[in-house]
A protein has these predicted regions:
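N-terminal active-site beta-alpha-beta segment that forms phosphate/nucleotide-binding
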Residues: 1-91
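Conserved phosphate- and dinucleotide-binding cores of soluble alpha/beta proteins
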Residues: 67-214
Length: 214
């Protein structure tokens, strides 16, 4: 009975933290979004999606570009959740991300104002997130578009992270035996591509976040 009480109390504490964290993240994202912004996101991050929905409910007017996120199409979940909350969403195939993010050569117009990415792990040297995230951050950096990581500070770890290789069947079911298929689930986003990080601790530079989290 005593162990059950401890477990219940611990679970409540964890849930309270995540609820508090999301509320704080929402406030900082709301301040960051300007009316008329086009925000690009990738995969499905609960922190990102919830904060965008919150900003919409608070009256901010913005559009979202997102990726389908192959091979499991998590981007569809993001698009549907945003659409159901009245947010204007345009979904791109993953390989068209550079087309969505880059400057227009004729008008020099940048299609995207900000990039919001979630995080599977926050590390000292950068962030681990869904495969494709590092590439999108690099494209954004070349076009001088700010990249913001939106995540709970509890995702910080000093452990070494091994990139998970997932089943080839996710990519090509019943593929010919002599064709090798690589299906990495995540990749690294270098710190130099990250303009800022939003956690329950606030919006700050990644260096500052590392100082606070110690």
């Amino acid at each position: 009975y005593h162990l059950h009480t401890i477990r219940t109390s611990l679970l409540k504490e964890i849930l309270n933290h995540f609820e508090f964290s999301q509320k704080e993240i929402n406030k900082h994202v709301l301040k960051l979004i300007n009316n008329g912004d086009v925000i690009f996101t990738h995969c499905h991050s609960t922190n990102v999606v919830n904060s965008l929905i919150y900003s919409k409910k608070k009256g901010k007017k913005f559009k979202v570009y997102n990726t389908e996120t192959r091979p499991l199409f998590q981007g569809r979940k993001t698009a549907v959740e945003l659409m159901k909350n009245g947010i204007d969403v345009t979904m791109f195939v993953d390989s068209a991300a550079a087309f969505a993010i880059k400057k227009d050569d004729k008008s020099d117009k940048i299609y995207v104002d900000k990039i919001f990415l979630g995080a599977d792990a926050l590390l000292k040297k950068g962030v681990i997130n869904k495969i494709g995230s590092g590439m999108f951050a690099e494209i954004a950096s070349r076009n001088k578009i700010p990249v913001y990581i939106i995540a709970d500070s509890w995702k910080f770890t000093k452990d070494k992270i091994k990139i998970e290789q997932r089943s080839l069947n996710e990519v090509w079911d019943k593929s010919p035996k002599n064709i090798k298929i690589k299906n990495p689930a995540f990749e690294f986003i270098k710190r130099k591509y990250i303009s800022g990080i939003i956690t329950e601790l606030g919006l700050m530079k990644y260096k500052e976040f590392l100082r606070k989290i110690k």
